[in-house]
Amino acid sequence: MMNVSLKLSFLVFILVIMSNLGSEARELAGVNEIFEIAARSSNNAGTARALQQAPPCKRDVDCSFECPKGGFCNDRLGTCDCF
């Protein structure tokens, strides 16, 4: 039984180390910065939709949550165009 608990604690330790290394690699490569800029951009609804995978709009009311200042639904593309 002691052997199992030792393996489990070692596995948790390895997982924590690996997740920290992945986070540092993303910071060094600048990937986090690209995602933050795209998520903050309210003028580019297409990029934010690609990152968050929001369902396509069908009516102007569907864009009320994506566009705090208002917007309209582009029926052809299924995206919200914000004002």
Swiss-Prot record:
Annotated protein name in UniProt: Putative defensin-like protein 257
Annotated GO biological process: defense response to fungus; killing of cells of another organism
One annotated Gene Ontology cellular component of this protein: extracellular region
Keyword Repeat part of the UniProt annotation: no
Secretion signal span: 1-25
Family: Belongs to the DEFL family.
Organism encoding this protein: Arabidopsis thaliana (Mouse-ear cress)
S-S bonds: 57-73, 63-80, 67-82
Subcellular location: Secreted
Domain of life: Eukaryota
